[in-house]
Amino acid sequence: NAVRALKEKGYAPIIYHELEARQLPPEFIYLALQESNYDERTIGPPTRYGRAKGMWQFIAATGSQYGLKIGPLKDTEQYDPVDERHHPLKSTIAAAKYLKYIYKTDAQASGLLVMASYNWGEGNVINRIRSMPLNPEDRNFWKLIASYEIPQETYDYVLYIFSAAVIGQNPKLFGFNFDNPLQGLDDTG
């Protein structure tokens, strides 16, 4: 179970701390669940942008932009211990920086738009947001999907993370046998 591995590997406090340090929602911890099941050795399929690698599934260009050293096996299907996209702490710091950047764009009105931007690319989402009414109430994920066609992958991505965040609040209520992975990580316990 990925959530159990999150706790056992000690990643929950690392991710929580980096999100909290940047005043980001702690529920963004579930992005790494959707990206890789919290597996730092994950390697994505080849794309026109290269291969995404690591727990946060950075392509080389984005990883480098956010301070990660990219290894010589960047576009191969091989794990590369030199590639910091595979490093749990360093890639989490980079992911938190990237999410903070997205949060400062036009996507800031909605955490769901930030998630869509992380998956589909902030340019794709922001270009559509900018053509929407200026009223913040009209600039949200639900209006985006009602007004524009977005990739099914992005739609599913956002809803899976949203669902994981809801379930994560009280997993036993939904029939899962694990505790809230965020429980006890904040000062209120």
Segments and roles (model prediction):
Residues 45-69:
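Short, surface-exposed glycine/acidic/tryptophan-bearing loops
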Residues 24-41, 114-119, 162:
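Short, functionally critical alpha-helical segments immediately adjacent to catalytic or ligand/cofactor-binding
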Residues 34-37, 61-63, 166:
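Solvent-exposed coil/turn segments that connect beta secondary-structure elements
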